[in-house]
Amino acid sequence: MKSNAPVDRNFDDLTEKFKRKVYGGLKGEIRLAVIWRDLNQVMALKVMGKPIRILDIGGGLGQLSTKLSLMGHQVSYNDISSSKMIEAQKLAKKNDQLNNIDWYNCPYQDLSPEILGRFDLVMWHAVIEWLADPDKLIEALTQLKAKNGVISLTFYNQNSLIYRNLLKGNFKLLEREFNADPGSLTPHTPFLPESVLLWIKANNLEILKSSGIRVFFDYISSLRGGHLNDVDLISKELEYSEVDPFKSLGRYIHYVLK
């Protein structure tokens, strides 16, 4: 019997669009720059350059997995999408890291700490908003985290979505429940930070680092001045991603948790 229960989103049908739209331009560069900055700060404090065990869940095109493997870390990559994993393996092979990364093409629920062990860093970036049961995620990540390990989590920020619609005059959209186009890469479940913080607290975790991702880029209606210089634009995104109130308007929020 076919179940009518909601299932986690698999991007096998949209991998090329994901590759082009999400990481084919500045949006993806800004996202990676903020996450990489935050992780480097925490990793430098925790491991002092020593190799650590890393689990990249929902690892997508594998940019972070490959980069961390090149640094000598022990990386395990996971994604429910086989087509995404193929793209990630292409990138790893190009950088001579294919055989240095462990590959798991399965739902995250199949990742067992009894089989895989526990990890010093568990990464989960921009996937919680695609889950059927997002409230169960942080507990699962905590089970995979080593005692003194950290979790890197990003989520689609509902406050950003509200603010963007206010700027565009889409007032009617704010009066009804948000529904994303099934063929769109816009997540169907944005979250208020307060909701995510409740799950964090329920699992006895603390926030070591918080940042906004794309705190102004997504609100630009026309590029001008410093917007036309990619290096300067990313530099300003990095600068204000850590500063209130700007970071609270990031399209995504990044938490590093312990």
Language-model regions: role of each:
Residues 209-258:
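A C-terminal cap/extension of S-adenosyl-L-methionine-dependent methyltransferases
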Residues 63-110:
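Class I SAM-dependent methyltransferase SAM/SAH-binding core
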Residues 180-195:
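Acceptor-substrate binding/catalytic loop of class I
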Residues 135-150:
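A short glycine-rich, Lys/Arg-flanked "PGG" loop and its adjoining helix->strand segment in the class I
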Residues 123:
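A conserved beta-strand element that flanks and buttresses the S-adenosyl-L-methionine
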Residues 1-60, 63, 67, 95, 150-177:
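Conserved class I S-adenosyl-L-methionine
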